[in-house]
């Protein structure tokens, strides 16, 4: 009986010692509003995964523009426009060719992103097995982006 109790105790101790203390699964990785500038641009905290830092940061920039266009910014201090630029149902699929070109690497989306609000320590890093997850602060020029989408016939005025 003592040996069985000792074996169960050791097994329990081994499980407790090897428990994963990783808190990254609980980290909020939704885009959030940090503020709105007088020119209508929105300062956002955006998260993305990538193979390395460069990939993750580039994906963050794409995610920021994508959120403003298709989802609106619902989290954060509430200053950002919660309404997406495109409210049409299935617009992403309807204009897939346009947005594939728009969001390609070094694509047109970069014209509407600014890193002016990035400061030291504004990048946060979480490491996973094969990928890294970064959160950065970016500014999206919503007004110019809206003008571009109107000019290109994606949204109506």
What are these regions (language model features)?
Residues 1-22:
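Bacterial Sec-dependent N-terminal signal peptides
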Residues 19-157:
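Domain-level marker for long, solvent-exposed, non-transmembrane regions
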């Amino acid at each position: 009986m003592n040996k069985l109790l000792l074996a169960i105790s050791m097994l329990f101790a081994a499980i407790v010692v090897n428990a994963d203390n990783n808190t990254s699964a609980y980290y909020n990785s939704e885009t959030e509003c940090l503020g709105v500038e007088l020119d209508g641009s929105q300062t956002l905290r955006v998260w993305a995964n990538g193979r390395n830092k460069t990939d993750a940061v580039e994906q963050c920039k794409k995610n920021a523009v994508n959120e403003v266009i298709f989802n609106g910014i619902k989290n954060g201090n509430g200053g950002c426009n919660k309404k997406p630029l495109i409210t049409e149902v299935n617009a992403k699929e309807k204009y897939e060719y346009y947005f594939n070109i728009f969001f390609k690497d070094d694509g047109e989306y970069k014209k509407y992103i600014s890193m002016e609000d990035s400061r030291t320590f504004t990048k946060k890093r979480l490491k996973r097995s094969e990928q890294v997850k970064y959160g950065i602060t970016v500014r999206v020029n919503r007004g110019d982006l809206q003008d571009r989408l109107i000019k290109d016939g994606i949204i109506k005025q």
